[in-house]
Every structure is written in C-alpha cells, then in structure tokens.
Amino acid sequence: MRGDMAGIFNDLLDDFEAADLTVVNLECPLIEHKSPILKSGPVLGVSIKCIRALKNAHINVINLANNHILDHSEQGLRNTMRICHEAGIEVVGAGENLADAGKILSMQVKSVRIGIMAIAEHEFSIATRNKPGANPLNMMEFVRQMRHHREKFDYVMVLLHGGTEYYPYPSPELQQVCRFMIEEGANAVICQQSHCPGCYEHYEGGYIVYGQGNLIFDAHSNQEKWNQGYLVSLFIKAEGADKMDIIPYIQSDKRAGVRRMDKDKEEAFKKDLHEMSARIKDIEFVEKQWREFCKNKRYVYFSVLRGHNRFLRGLNRLVHFSDWFYSRSELATLQHVIRCESLREVLNTILSSS
C-alpha cells in the first residue's frame, strides 16, 4: 500500500520498465469500504492505496474482465475504474454496461496500432445491458467485434479469463475457442484463470497461452504450482510479425512479492513447459487428459451439485456416498438439462432470478 514496487516486483521491475506496453490482470476491486455480494467462492478486495505500486511499476493497462471484479458490488467496480483513471492507467474489460465493458482498448505503441479485447467466462461478475460488470465470453459478439473493428489495428490481443483451476492443459472446448479467435483475426490470446502455469501454442501465426499462473496472490494454497507463473513478452512489428518469450518467476512463497527464478530453475521450468506444450498439438491427447482430469473431479462436482459443506465434500471424495443419490436415470436427466442449450438457458434464467 506504500507504493513500494521494488519490494513487490523485485527484479521483474526491469522487465516492466523495459516494455513499451505493460498489461496486468487485476483480480479484485480497489475498495475504500466493503460491500460484498452474494456469490459462490471467495470475495476479494484490496485497498485503493495499492494503486500506487501499480503506477510506480510502469503498468499501462489493467484488465478488469475476471470473476472477482464485481465482488464488492457495482460500487467496488466503479471505484476501481475511477482510481485507475486518476492514476493515468487504462482499463479494459469492464464498464457501466455490456456495451461499455465490451469496448476494444486502442493503444498506439510507436508505429503499431494495438487493440486489446478483454473477456471473462460467465460467473458473478458479468455486465448486462443495464448493469455494470465484466465483458462476458460470447463468441457471436466476438465475431461481430472483429468484423467491425479488426482493420483499425495492426495487432489484436485477446485477454480471456477462462480455463479450469489448477489444470495446465486446455480443455477441448477452451482450445477450440482460443484457436477460433486466432482464425478470426486475433494475433494473441492470453488466458488468465487457472492459478497455475499453463501450456502455450503457436497456431496459424498467432500465440495462445492457456494460463500464466498467479502474479501476486499471497493466499495459502496446497497446490504445487500456486507460487509459480510467467510473464508473456510479445515482440510486435507494424506488419503483424511477432515473437513470444516467457519470463518465469516465483511469487508469495517464503518471501513476499514476486521475483525471477534463478537460472537453473528457469531453464528447467521452460524445458518442462515446452515439453507439455508440444503435447497439446495432438487433439487426442488433449481429450484424454481432460477426461482423466474430470474423472478425478467426479465426486467434487457431485458434492457441489448437492450443496455439501467442506466436511461432506471431503468425505464424499473418500467414500463416494453421492453415488447413492444418483441413479443412472437421474444422471441422464441431469446431463440432459446441462447439455441441451435450450434447457440450460431455462435453468440459468431460473437460477439468475432466484
């Protein structure tokens, strides 16, 4: 809160300062007073004084399209946008309404015209036609945006807050979505939700990153990769040619803040990630890994559906008692309601109105 960017970003500051344009995801509102909403999952928020460190770290753009930006209601979001504006930092991915949240941010960097789109999966932060929030993932709207605005930019970057927590590979659907965005004219798609370092790929001339990991997130976690992540460096030319590099780091372990990995750890990290990333070119591998991951999550999600508390969720993982409540016929009905687009829309509308 004192604006001590050196104590927070340590040797990553050199990379921030060397960049012509620095973009970060702010996964919580900047607040003066708490005004938490009713939602599933943790409610996050930090003091408005934290803007000092972001400004002093030479951050140019803050992405607000994520699942926590509305955690402290419309008041928290509006406060965040105001504080960023007063600090001279651009924001993207959220706004006063759906149209405002979906605006492409235009940045001129030397001779290169860069367009930044920021999009979030549907959670408790989404803007509507008349209410503030984050820009939702809507592929039809994405295509419209690209048709109407693509020619205005030399380079289009999409920041997608999507993916499965603690899963380093893309799901089959996420990979399809990101690849389609490249096919429609995006030059880079950067996903930022997994809380662990994710794979990347070069696809039809564009770059896709399936998760960068946490940058500054000092919450305690037993997840192995919680304290690891990487910056994405894009080297862009006006004619559209580009190159991508990654800068691995350690964050919020026994020391506060974030710092680059030492040379040996960085080389090992890059090697492992490169090998993992090579595997996702094989669609069958992506599908097989996803099925295995979901198989291991079966009883977690069945507990969620039945509203179990933490104790019952843990017990269900051990003894699988939720199997007693779901016959094959009941599972088929559940699948039908979730899988069918029209039925899913009905269910979502009912729950949203409750």
What are these regions (language model features)?
Residues 33-55, 155-187:
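Active-site-proximal segments of metal-dependent phosphoesterases and phosphodiesterases across multiple
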Residues 1-10, 44, 108-156, 176, ...:
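Binuclear metal-dependent hydrolase catalytic cores centered on His/Asp/Glu-rich metal-binding motifs
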Residues 1, 30-33, 67-81, 98-103, ...:
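Active-site environment of divalent metal-dependent phosphoester hydrolases
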Residues 231-354:
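A short C-terminal boundary segment appended to hydrolase-like catalytic domains
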Residues 24, 64, 68, 117, ...:
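Divalent metal-coordination and catalytic microenvironments
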Residues 58-61, 172-231:
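Conserved beta-sheet core of the metallophosphoesterase superfamily
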Residues 19-31, 66-67, 146-169:
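Short acidic, glycine-rich surface-loop motifs adjacent to enzyme active sites
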